[in-house]
C-alpha cells in the first residue's frame, strides 16, 4: 500500500516502512505524528484519489532525527560594476519513518 501525502508545501509518495526527509516538523525525536493531508491512496491496481484530500485517510509516522541539508551557495554578480555577493543557505529537515497507512 502506498499514499501521496502533502507536508511542508511538498508532495511525497510514501509506503509503509520507508524513511523520508521532509521539511522541519516541530516534534520530538521518537514521537509519533499523524499526517492527515493524504492526496491519494493506492494498493495493487486500485487507486483512490481525493478531491483534493481522501476523507478518513491517515498516515502515521515516527520522527527519527532532525538535521540540516548540505550548504548551497548563492552567487549574485553584476557585470562590469564590480558587484559580487556571496551567500550560503542550509535548510532544516526532519527525518521520519512511515509506520502505517490507513484509508
Curated annotation (Swiss-Prot):
Keywords: Ribonucleoprotein, Ribosomal protein, RNA-binding, rRNA-binding. InterPro entries: bL21-like, bL21-like_sf, Ribosomal_bL21, Ribosomal_bL21_CS. GO terms for molecular function: rRNA binding; structural constituent of ribosome. One of its GO terms (cellular component) is ribosome. Coiled coil: none annotated. It comes from the Bacteria. GO terms for biological process: translation. Part of the 50S ribosomal subunit. Contacts protein L20. Belongs to the bacterial ribosomal protein bL21 family. This protein binds to 23S rRNA in the presence of protein L20. PANTHER family: 50S RIBOSOMAL PROTEIN L21, LARGE RIBOSOMAL SUBUNIT PROTEIN BL21M. NCBIfam families: L21 (TIGR00061). This is Large ribosomal subunit protein bL21. The lineage of its organism: Bacteria, Pseudomonadati, Pseudomonadota, Betaproteobacteria, Burkholderiales.
